[in-house]
Amino acid sequence: MNFLKWLIPSRNERELKKLWPLVRRINEIEAGLQKLSDDELRQKTADWKTRLSQIQDREELARTLDEILPETFAVVKNACRRLTERKTEIIVREHPLLWEMIPFDVQLIGGYALHSGRIAEMATGEGKTLVATLPVYLNALTGRGVHLVTVNDYLAARDSEWMGAIYKFLGLTVGVILHDQPPRVRREQYNCDITYGTNAEFGFDYLRDNGMAARKEEQVQRGHYFAIVDEVDSILIDEARTPLIISGPSVHTYDEQYAQWKPLVESLVRAQERLCARFLSEAEAMIKQLNPTDGSNPQNPEALENQIGMLLFRVKTGQPKSEGLMKFLEDPENLKLMNRAELDLHKDQKKVDLYREKEELLFAIDEKGFEADLTEKGRNFVSPKDPEAFVLPELTTLLHEIDTGPEPDARKRMEAKTKVQQDFETKAQKIHAISQLLKAYSLYQRDVEYVIQDNKVIIVDQHTGRLMPGRRWSDGLHQAVEAKEGVEIERETQTLATITIQNYFRLYQKLAGMTGTAETEASEFFDIYKLGVLVIPTNEPCVRKDANDAVYKTRREKFNTVLNEIKQIHALGRPILVGTISVEVSEQLSRLLKREGIIHSVLNAKYHQQEAEIIMRAGQRGAVTIATNMAGRGTDIKLGPGVAELGGLHVMGTERHEARRIDRQLRGRCARQGDPGSSHFFISLEDDLMRLFGSDRIVKMMERMGLEEGQELTHPWLNRSIQQAQKRVEQHNFQIRKRTLEYD
């Protein structure tokens, strides 16, 4: 097969081969530009702008841009050369940064891919940020505005200052859209030749312009000509599940309901904890019966095994993250019994037994579907004196009965109808408030899905690890979380305007994107956005050493090993970047390192203000940095003096993410541009990915090998099994995105 690959070049290789003559042409032109003065070089920008401003026809404009592409790319490359040779210092996010970048040949190819409306897949560290300057400069000459879309405000501000040095040197204007800017400032930024910002800011401005601006003068955007999306997989795939929503104060607000029902839901959650603890102690007693210490044979072992499996399944359904359950499942035999019980319950198409098992609980939690539902037992607990408390009557039937009833007085009939409607609304509000509070208590975890800052609940973006101030969960969920945390419950909102990310980006005449990881989702990019992917070769071969994943039974064993590896690598003087999946885990690991006396930095949603300084220090000798997936994108960790000789940056992942791309992004923080580096991922069977989407094959393999406490399992086959689990989640999320688009 490898022989055939060598014999028949891939489509990607054929595409690249066609582009090398263009690269040679750009370099020839650039050599000739070196004798021009700065003013003569800048004059080219003015001349092209004048020429392009006279072209109205879209096809003619596209032809002209293709025609001038070699010279415009050469001009950008020459401007970079001048800034480098003059050792120009640029102030980026209040830090002086020496300009030392001149586009490589492979970056020129990346620039062409973007101009032609494709996704350029470039390995992390290959300078995607610089690549974008080539097509951005070319298309900005049209005067129609080019939008460069980043994953967060920090990168938008950073890149507008950093890459802005090139554009300004060549005579173009650069703007940046940031959270909390007033409309007047936003309008000025959009009127620049080039505008940086996040997808959310661009999308919300579009919604405000088209849903809330009364006059054209109140609008801030001026059209959708060309957008380049940085980290395109994060924005067009990961975030595409969430539509952008502008909301206003709700006409009817029931915020007091959440505070009113909070004590009841709290007592319900505590009662469920006691119930699950009882099931676990019953299971423990049965396990002792199954394995008697006196060597005798247990009576009816099969029935005992079934009962143990059912009890463990109940706890998994009622309290899936219970520490007691995790401890039980450390024994592969118990895990096997629970999985077998679950399989038996799902065999019956009518799900009678499954329903009966769930009815032993007060509420059932579905982690995959992010749902929590009261059972009959739970409804009786919440409302023991009113069995109909959670049954909504048929309103139209009740109103019809009043209209056709014996009451002759029209006013009294109207009063009766008003009372029926009010009772119905009160009941519906109560059911809704209790349902949302139950979700808040059982599915939304502090320092994972959200953090508390300044007495407010702030959502944490699960893909970027960053805070999302100003964003609120809809449908009363945010109020439920506020009630749970005892902070001020803000007023409920109603949707005024909404658009999906997919449909917003379809507004652009031309769309392109960059990422280190697009090939895995190439078909989705093409199906939804009609974007092809061109994989750009690296400038220097990657010499990173990727160790096989280390798999442990428990989180405790996993973190002990992570700690030991940090100590070993730290003793060598190599810098270490430890990736975590949530704020909570990053702080837990930080406490362990403090106990060991290891000086380190923490980069998570709570400390995002120090991001630039932390990243600047992360590649220095002996540095230890713990980071959520905030550090996975757009951050360039440069190695300090003498670090390359020690082996470069060592990246450690404490868990596999739902999306393989995010793991690849973390790995890509090291061994950039031919530097040395290494990576190692650590996994436990208690991690969410393995619990929810993992395979029984891994458990069976660990069982066969009879692993002792603290022993790890590593094998390339195991890596494939973990990737299969990730693929299952990706497929699950792809179906959600398809449905989101269908209903927009």
Label for each model-derived stretch:
Residues M1-G706, R737:
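Conserved P-loop NTPase motor core
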Residues D696-N733:
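C-terminal helicase lobe
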Residues N733-D744:
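C-terminal accessory/connector segments of nucleic-acid motor ATPases
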